[in-house]
Curated annotation (Swiss-Prot):
InterPro entries: YspA. Disulfide bonds: none annotated. Signal peptide: none annotated. It comes from the Bacteria. Belongs to the UPF0398 family. This is UPF0398 protein SPD_0338. It holds the Pfam family YpsA. It comes from Streptococcus pneumoniae serotype 2 (strain D39 / NCTC 7466). The lineage of its organism: Bacteria, Bacillati, Bacillota, Bacilli, Lactobacillales.
Length: 175
């Protein structure tokens, strides 16, 4: 059973503040293409942390593909309090993360930074790969976790990059 941890830029990181942003269509097209390849490579479980942006868009696409590709979806939140202060629209998105095949919380609430380190280590040890929208030239808080992934032995990282999106956009506009 191959499992992929899904992580990537937040909508804020990308400057995408509307679900109707035309760039989302292109991002979701790239996600669909990547998920098809991952399914062909034997990935059956997609593991989310409940973050808005890339993770949520992958969740949306994976739910559309679930029946055809047999994906199982899991959300492992760091804390039970995750998203409790989000606005109503984001609460709706959070509820989709909670309506998957498997949901767990690592901790009741944040108490110290060691929890996040242990949570990240748990995610790495319990997945065989990751699907990551991250570009080293556009660093965010994912930089540390990305380094840990690269240092994890026998851990495959499938990346979506801005270059890939630009190439897809060029091909998309030519058709």
């Amino acid at each position: 059973m191959a499992t992929a941890l899904v992580l990537g830029y937040s909508a804020f990181d990308l400057g995408l503040f509307s679900d109707k942003d035309p760039r989302l269509k292109l991002i979701k097209k790239a996600i669909r293409k990547d998920l098809e390849a991952m399914a062909a490579d034997g990935v059956s479980w997609l593991v989310f942390t409940g973050s808005l942006g890339f993770e949520y868009w992958v969740l949306e696409v994976a739910q559309e593909m679930k029946t055809e590709y047999g994906f199982q979806l899991a959300t492992i939140f760091a804390f039970e309090t995750h998203g409790e202060n989000w606005n109503e629209g984001n609460q709706m998105k959070l509820s989709r993360f909670k309506q998957v095949d498997f949901v767990k919380y690592a901790y009741p609430r944040y108490e110290h930074k060691g929890q996040l380190r242990d949570y990240q280590q748990f995610l790495l040890e319990n997945t065989t790969s990751s699907y990551l929208f991250y570009d080293e030239e556009n660093e965010t808080k994912l930089a540390y976790f990305y380094q840990k992934m690269k240092n994890q032995e026998d851990y495959f990282i499938k990346r979506l990059t801005f270059d890939q999106l630009n190439e897809l956009a060029e091909n998309f506009s030519e058709n």
